[in-house]
A protein has these predicted regions:
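Membrane-embedded beta-barrel scaffold of Gram-negative outer-membrane proteins
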Residues: 384-389, 393-409, 583, 589-599, ...
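Gram-negative outer-membrane beta-barrel transporters
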Residues: 438, 448, 518, 645, ...
Length: 842
């Protein structure tokens, strides 16, 4: 795959005007005190820059209001970042170190600027440049760089984003529960899991925080958080353009423009576009076209107004429209269930004179007679106000977002007219308001306190629809009665569901940091939650044979039934935690955390199972989760050119919210239930090593055990369908979606600075590999629905210019490894199951 990156930086067009502060001047030297000529000094996210002369002297005549970050760089040296909060304390001599020493990464997860190595939190940071170089343009690809992250997606709505195996239900999504992993972009909480399908645009950095973070973020996060920060508008005009080409018709284009919008540069803006297209990776013999393509368009704009040094106002608006013909799954295998022989999948399709198009899922061939569609549209606006008060900043973030979902699925995964329609069209709107203060309260005490409100409205548009076809009788047949063969009995028989979920949540949260000494720090945190959910669910049957025959009506009710229920639930809860941190020395920071947290009450929004013909209304409400968590770790710099971090963690959850599958067609998307107790424990390590100025190595490793300590009323796995028991005790068994081992390793080799393509830059060659051990893909452990372990290798090489034109080629899954990402049973548990396939070599 070839990727061309055009970067056009326009020259400065004037000073900041009368409002600007005084400039900055100084000298850039190396560690031996020798001047570094031609060093670049710039204001981060501003494009305002200067070049040092032959004696290393530079001058930046205009700078933005405090605080800001300076970047000083030169070929052969590490980029040096300086957070400027007080000009009086700023040195006039800036020392660059040889780039065989690692650069510290600055983050804002604790609502202030600090380095990742100094924060007593298990955190992984991926810069925007690292994500772009690795081709990680969305969360699904980013997971390869952070092994503790698991993402499973059979389409954008049915997406599971977990950290350490916790966060959301595995498999299909039920809209009635909250995610345990918070997803934030520029301080705004994104409530819908479909947001993880967004293409990254203008990303500055991605911070992945592991473990409960409810003391720091507005929305409660019991498993962790993604905190994504975009590049801010600059006061100097600039533009970037990037286009990538690849096999399967892949093309991706991104462009961004930034600069001042007024003469005094108090108002600046950034305008960004992105587009991704790729042909389908599966071939449908029925439609005679390739499906599972990519078709994404995104638009994002930012306006930033700085009327004074103390006040910054940022407006952001974005729209993303994704219209792929996807996401189809491939039949991956057939299991013999405990039903009678005539109810086995192979016997059923033999009676219907049907054969699967292939027995090898990696032929990537399907014969689906219902079109696949995943219309995914997200957008919104936000207004962020930062105002410096005393030694801190008061922040207000107001946001409105929407999500429109327009799908079509073939849930029987065959050419047979079994489930001819499965369309859960939905509309969602959310409003959030967060107010917080972060700063120093005294010389030894700092922290963050805040309040958060969220209001959500999710409704069908106009309804969810499931419809059977003429072959449904054979899959539903549970007796030898000839009544099942009644012509037209199930043809066009379906359900239309009107539902609405209205959610309101409020929280007070905060965390303090008390410097007991120069080395010992105590960080207590507390949170109060209020959650209210109101749901109305109304499902009506329609179609099929119109008859008054009680026997035929009874057969129809075995497939679909009317359902109606309402649920009104509300809960309040206190939670909190305590972190102790000790800096043994500058290169060794140890920490330990204990916390209790809470995941709100849930409601079933995909229909309820039945027992002896009666709807199990007791399952309409799902108990909240109670999470007890501890972790301890250390962040170290063994040498000046290396880091090594390790953390041990243990989480116990009571009333774990999980999604379970049912053989009932009426709840083929599964339903929510509580597992009494689960626990997750393990350790994680990550490290970086700058061998010399040419070679950089890095790696991550995660060991995770996730198990049900007590789940006495779990559904039976696929192969036990038809047994005398509908539920079983799976206590002591493993949870789905969690590999015992997962890791990544990589490195980059660069040349000395040279001229190429008319620009100064470096040649580079990089490789990275991601691997994970096998894992269960069934809520109740199965002998068959287990995904084998796999490893993939990616590579890239080319020329990276300091400014101007860069050119490089890259390949993912270079050895074309065939692997599954997820396995899931077909509706009705007839015995066949499908797979979400990993991408081939691209």
């Amino acid at each position: 795959m070839r990727r061309i990156v055009f970067v056009i930086i326009f020259a400065s067009i004037g000073s900041l005007g009368a409002w600007a502060q005084q400039g900055i001047s100084g000298t850039v030297t190396d560690q031996q005190g020798r001047p570094v000529p031609a060093a670049t000094i710039k204001i981060k996210d501003d494009n305002n820059q200067a070049i040092a002369d032959s004696t290393g002297v530079f001058s930046l005549p205009s700078i933005p209001p405090l605080p800001f970050t300076m970047e000083i760089s030169s070929a052969g040296f590490n980029t040096h970042e300086i957070v400027v909060t007080d000009l009086k304390k700023l040195t006039s001599q800036f020392i660059l170190v040889n780039n065989n020493e690692l650069t510290e990464v600055v983050i804002t997860s604790r609502r202030r600027l600090e380095t990742a190595q100094s924060v007593p939190i298990a955190i992984s940071v991926i810069t925007g440049k690292q994500a772009e170089d690795a081709g990680a343009f969305n969360v699904n690809r980013l997971k390869e760089l952070v092994p503790s992250v698991q993402l499973y997606s059979s389409n954008p709505r049915n997406t599971t984003l977990n950290i350490r195996g916790m966060g959301s239900t595995f498999g299909l999504t039920n809209d009635g529960i909250d995610p345990g992993v918070g997803f934030y972009i520029d301080g705004v909480y994104y409530a819908r899991p479909a947001a993880t399908a967004l293409d990254f645009v203008d990303v500055d950095r991605i911070e992945v925080l592991r473990g409960p973070q409810g003391n720091l973020f507005g929305k409660n996060t019991t498993a962790g958080a993604f905190n994504i920060t975009s590049r801010a508008p600059g006061t100097t005009p600039g533009a970037t353009f990037e286009v990538s080409y690849g096999n399967f018709g892949f093309i991706q284009a991104k462009t961004s423009f930034t600069g001042p919008l007024t003469k005094n540069k108090k108002l600046t803006g950034r305008l960004s576009f992105s587009g991704t297209q790729r042909n389908g990776l599966l071939y449908n013999t029925i439609s005679q076209k390739h499906i599972n393509d990519l078709n994404n368009l995104g638009f994002r704009t930012q306006l930033q107004y700085r009327p004074t040094e103390k006040l910054k106002i940022t407006f952001i608006g974005d729209i993303t429209d994704q219209k792929p013909d996807g996401y189809a799954q491939v039949v991956a295998g057939v299991v013999k269930t405990q039903r009678p022989e005539y109810r086995q999948f192979n016997a059923i399709i033999a009676d219907l004179n049907y054969r699967l198009p292939t027995s090898n899922p990696f032929d990537r061939i399907v014969d689906h007679n219902t079109p696949w569609r995943s219309g995914n549209q997200l957008g919104g606006t936000s207004l962020n106000v930062d105002y410096k008060i005393g030694s801190g900043t008061l922040t207000s973030t107001t946001a409105w977002r929407y999500w429109n979902w327009d799908p079509s699925n073939d849930r029987d995964f065959t050419a047979l007219p079994v489930l001819t329609l499965s369309q859960a069209t939905s509309k969602h709107q959310q409003f959030t308001q967060e107010i917080r203060y972060a700063g120093d309260f005294s010389q030894k005490l700092n922290g963050v306190i805040g309040a958060f409100l969220i209001d959500q409205d999710l409704k069908t548009d106009p309804y969810h629809i499931e419809e059977s076809g003429s072959a449904q009788w054979r899959f539903s047949q549970s007796t030898s009665s000839n009544l099942w063969k009644t012509p037209g009995l199930f043809d066009g028989y379906g359900i239309r569901t009107n539902s609405r979920l209205q959610t309101f949540g409020a929280a007070l949260f905060g965390q303090l940091e008390w410097a007991v000494s120069d080395r010992f720090f105590v960080m207590p945190g507390v949170r109060f939650n209020y959650d209210k959910k109101d749901v109305e669910f109304d499902r009506k049957t329609y179609g099929g044979l119109q008859t008054t025959d009680p026997a035929l009506l009874a057969l129809k009710r075995l497939v679909y039934t009317d359902q109606f229920f309402t649920a009104n639930v509300e809960e309040t809860n206190f939670s909190g935690g305590l972190t102790l941190a000790y800096k043994i020395e500058k290169k060794f920071n140890a920490f330990a955390t204990y916390s209790i947290s809470y995941k709100p009450v849930g409601v079933n929004l995909g229909g309820l199972p039945t027992s002896n013909g009666a709807v199990m209304l007791e399952l309409a409400r799902i108990k909240p989760e109670y999470v007890t968590h501890w972790e301890m770790g250390a962040k170290t710099n063994p040498t000046k050119n290396s880091t090594f971090n390790v953390v041990f963690h243990h989480t116990a959850i009571e009333d774990y919210q999980t999604l379970v599958q049912s053989p009932e067609i009426g709840v083929n998307r599964g339903y929510l239930a509580n597992a009494e107790k689960v626990r997750v424990f393990g350790f994680e390590t990550d490290g970086n090593l700058r061998v010399n100025k040419h070679l950089w190595l890095y790696g991550n490793l995660a060991y995770t055990i996730a198990e049900y300590q007590q789940f006495s009323n779990a559904p039976v796995p696929l192969e036990e369908t038809g047994s005398t028991k509908s539920f079983k005790d799976i206590s002591g068994n493993r949870m789905p979606g969690v590999s015992k081992w997962a890791g990544s390793i990589g490195g980059e080799l660069t040349s000395n600075t040279r001229k190429a393509l008319g620009n100064s830059g470096k040649l580079f060659f990089a490789m990275d590999s991601y691997a994970r051990s096998e894992f269960s893909s069934s809520p109740s452990p199965s002998k068959y629905l287990n995904v084998p372990g796999y490893a993939t290798l990616n590579t890239r090489f080319g020329f990276r210019a300091d400014e101007g034109l860069s050119l490089f080629a890259w390949a993912r899954n270079i050895f074309n490894k065939n692997y599954f990402e997820q396995l899931l049973p077909a509706a009705g548990n007839a015995g066949h199951y499908a797979a979400v396939l990993g991408d081939p070599r691209t």
